[in-house]
Regions:
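Bacterial Sec-dependent N-terminal signal peptides
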Residues: 1-12
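C-terminal motif of bacterial Sec signal peptides marking the signal peptidase cleavage site
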Residues: 24-27
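N-terminal targeting/tethering segments
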Residues: 33-152
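FKBP-type peptidyl-prolyl cis-trans isomerase
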Residues: 38-66, 100-106, 159-170, 184-185, ...
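Extracytoplasmic
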Residues: 38-46, 51, 87, 113, ...
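Solvent-exposed aromatic/hydrophobic patches embedded in short alpha-helical segments
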Residues: 51, 80, 84-106, 117, ...
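Peptidyl-prolyl cis-trans isomerase
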Residues: 78-79, 83, 215-257, 287-288, ...
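Acidic/polar surface patches and capping/hinge elements
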Residues: 140-146, 151-154, 167-199, 230-231
Length: 338
């Protein structure tokens, strides 16, 4: 679990590297005052703490640079650009609200360390990030590209450090029972075979159910599947007889209904009724399949336990933070974000 948490935290920190840049003030006179007023606009309240639009935008400068590059300096006149900025603002605001909620409740739990300790842990995370660069020059170049100094970036790491500390305390007593392990094993045996089970299907994709039924009728009369695929198929596989090559049973790259239908077939057989997916209607043939014995539960018990522990911990975390949010008297003023 510790390795996975570190990986997760590193992903958070990598995201921060790409999105933290304090906006510089532009313009002068009345324009400057208008911008200052906009930046002070309160867009959320959490407990008694206020979040301003300026604080939100301080995390979005790289987004603004991307928008300017795509839409030009007059991006504010572009509806699509402003809608994108609004969605990014709302996403950052959600993160900032949660940071406050988590820190507040971490303080109540007595698990938030001193500022010195938070600084130390943030520095450790920064050092880990530095190690991902081959040279210090590359690291400094990345900071410059993100528009941050090392000091300002360090500040952006602290909420993630605090969240991780609170997370570990919230989930520390989460367990996995033997019953949960057995149930998961029984329901996911295709994930624990000696080698990955796989099927090699071919298909003929058509637009209507009736077209698929007509193809099945022709197959029943002995016509060749590959020739029918070339004649009737509507996707790129028609030119190779509808062959989709090998697909593992656990693949997430295919529609679940389609894959289950393919797996259910014996080698050389085809579906007797059309298979409906978001793409249309399929007639599927099993060209070949390979199935292997399931490994004994004792061999995979620890791996299953780790998988379930992560799931249970995540569920506990979501449940806890959701409850905290309800008690935080959160007020979002989305109409002030445009």
């Amino acid at each position: 679990m510790e390795d996975n948490k570190l990986i997760k935290l590193k992903k958070i920190l990598a995201g921060l590297m790409a999105s933290t840049l304090m906006l510089s003030a532009v313009g002068c006179g009345m324009i400057e005052k208008t911008e200052a007023g906009i930046n002070k606009t309160v867009v959320a309240k959490v407990y008694k703490e206020k979040i301003t639009l300026g604080e939100v935008d301080s995390r979005l400068a790289t987004v603004y640079e991307q928008v300017k590059a795509q839409y030009g300096e007059n991006y504010k006149e572009n509806t699509e650009a402003m809608e994108y900025i609004k969605q990014q603002r709302l996403s950052v605001l959600d993160t900032m609200v949660n940071d406050i909620v988590i820190k507040n409740n971490g303080t109540k739990l007595g698990v938030i360390p001193s500022d010195e300790e938070v600084n130390k842990k943030a520095k450790e995370q920064l050092d880990e990030i530095k190690k991902s660069f081959e040279t210090d020059e590359e690291y400094q170049s990345a900071l410059k590209a993100a528009g941050v100094t090392e000091e300002s970036f360090l500040e952006e790491l602290k909420p993630a450090v605090i969240s991780n500390i609170v997370y570990e305390d919230v989930v520390k007593d989460v367990k996995v029972t033997d019953e949960e392990i057995k149930s998961y094993y029984d329901s996911n045996q295709n994930s624990y075979t000696e080698k990955p089970n796989r099927v090699k299907p071919a298909h003929i994709l058509v637009k209507t159910e009736q077209e698929a039924k007509d193809i099945i009728a022709r197959l029943d009369k002995g016509e060749d599947f590959a020739k029918l695929a070339a004649e009737k198929g509507t996707d790129g596989t028609k030119d190779n007889g509808g062959d989709l090559d090998w697909i593992e049973y656990t693949s997430n790259q295919y529609d679940k209904t389609f894959l289950m239908a393919a797996i259910s077939l014996e080698k050389g057989t085809y579906t007797k009724t059309p298979v409906s997916t978001q793409f249309g209607f399929h007639v599927i043939k099993c060209l070949d399949k390979e199935e292997y014995p399931v490994r004994p539960i004792d061999e995979v018990k620890e791996a299953i336990k780790n998988t379930l522990l992560e799931q249970n911990q995540y569920n506990k975390w979501v449940e806890t933070v959701t409850a905290w949010q309800k008690d935080a008297n959160i007020k979002l003023y989305e109409d002030r974000i445009s």
